[in-house]
Amino acid sequence: MVAWLWKVLVGVGLSALAHAAFSAAQHRSHTRLAEMKYEPLPTDIVLQTLLAFALTCYGVVHTAGDFRDRDATSELKNVTFDTLRNRPSFYVFQHSGSSLLQPSDTTRSSNLNVPSSDDIRLKF
């Protein structure tokens, strides 16, 4: 079928779902105002909801297009071993562990005679 027809089918299904929800809310409001005991939803609202849901799902499945294969070998052909497990979202540049690697004040006070790397300048 034509692609736009599936989108129209989704639209019709969603509007039918909205209408069924409105009908259910209106039925509940009516039973409250009439001070009736709890009554289940009428059969036509339940059937409309189920039919609209099925129609919407059917349209969405066809609108989504072709599914990709689960076999990832075609995508992994051009990937090197170094980039295979590369996850940039796990990169941490400033973490609290760097403070553990710095020397404490006691070791720094004992090495006061040794010039630090900031004091040494290269002359060319």
UniProtKB/Swiss-Prot annotation:
Keywords: Endosome, Golgi apparatus, Magnesium, Membrane, Transmembrane, Transmembrane helix, Transport. InterPro entries: MMgT (IPR018937). Residues 23-44 are lumenal. GO terms for biological process: magnesium ion transport. Residues 1, 66-124 are cytoplasmic. Pfam families: MMgT. One of its GO terms (cellular component) is EMC complex. The chain crosses the membrane at residues 2-22, 45-65. It is a multi-pass membrane protein. One of its GO terms (molecular function) is magnesium ion transmembrane transporter activity. It is found in: Golgi apparatus membrane; Early endosome membrane. Belongs to the membrane magnesium transporter (TC 1.A.67) family. Mediates Mg(2+) transport. This is Membrane magnesium transporter 2.
